[in-house]
């Protein structure tokens, strides 16, 4: 009998495998992405101190009124621009990109490219 694979469980395994190699430092923190069906979230994390330095999502009041639906590529681009803007304000220019076990495609790719256009280097 063929068992159906749980895609979220596979994603979590990929994420743990990647997290063994990638970690954020105070000089170069980690840009983490989480994607749900309706929203997308991004955080810049210093793993040494275990603190979130900057966060942005489609649930932010700044973006909530501008974008209608948070689960599309346009919303991901808006979150990427917002996270880059907030990071620059805190003096963060270089980050390590953590795609969270998701494929580098679609909304994750759009967020990353918008963050790069906003001035983040990774």
Curated annotation (Swiss-Prot):
Keyword rRNA-binding belongs to the record: yes
rRNA-binding found in the keyword field: yes
Cited Gene3D superfamilies: 3.30.420.100
Coiled coil: none
Gene Ontology CC entries for this record: cytosolic large ribosomal subunit
GO molecular function: 5S rRNA binding; structural constituent of ribosome
This protein's UniProt keywords: Ribonucleoprotein, Ribosomal protein, RNA-binding, rRNA-binding
GO BP annotations, alphabetical order: translation
Quaternary structure (record): Part of the 50S ribosomal subunit; part of the 5S rRNA/L5/L18/L25 subcomplex. Contacts the 5S and 23S rRNAs.
Homology family: Belongs to the universal ribosomal protein uL18 family.
Biological function: This is one of the proteins that bind and probably mediate the attachment of the 5S RNA into the large ribosomal subunit, where it forms part of the central protuberance.
PANTHER family, sorted: 39S RIBOSOMAL PROTEIN L18, MITOCHONDRIAL (PTHR12899), LARGE RIBOSOMAL SUBUNIT PROTEIN UL18M (PTHR12899:SF3)
HAMAP family associated with the record: Ribosomal_uL18_B (MF_01337_B)
Name of protein: Large ribosomal subunit protein uL18
Source species of the chain: Carboxydothermus hydrogenoformans (strain ATCC BAA-161 / DSM 6008 / Z-2901)
């Amino acid at each position: 009998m063929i068992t159906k694979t749980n895609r979220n469980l596979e994603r979590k395994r990929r994420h743990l495998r990647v997290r063994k190699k990638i970690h954020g430092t105070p000089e170069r923190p980690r840009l983490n992405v989480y994607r749900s069906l309706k929203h997308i979230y991004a955080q810049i994390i210093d793993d040494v101190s275990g603190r979130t330095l900057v966060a942005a999502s489609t649930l932010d009041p700044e973006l909530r009124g501008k974008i209608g639906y948070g689960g599309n590529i346009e919303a991901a681009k808006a979150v990427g621009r917002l996270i880059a803007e907030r990071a620059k304000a805190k003096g963060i220019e270089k980050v390590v990109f953590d795609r969270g076990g998701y494929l580098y495609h679609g909304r994750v790719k759009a967020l990353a490219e918008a963050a790069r256009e906003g001035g983040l280097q990774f």
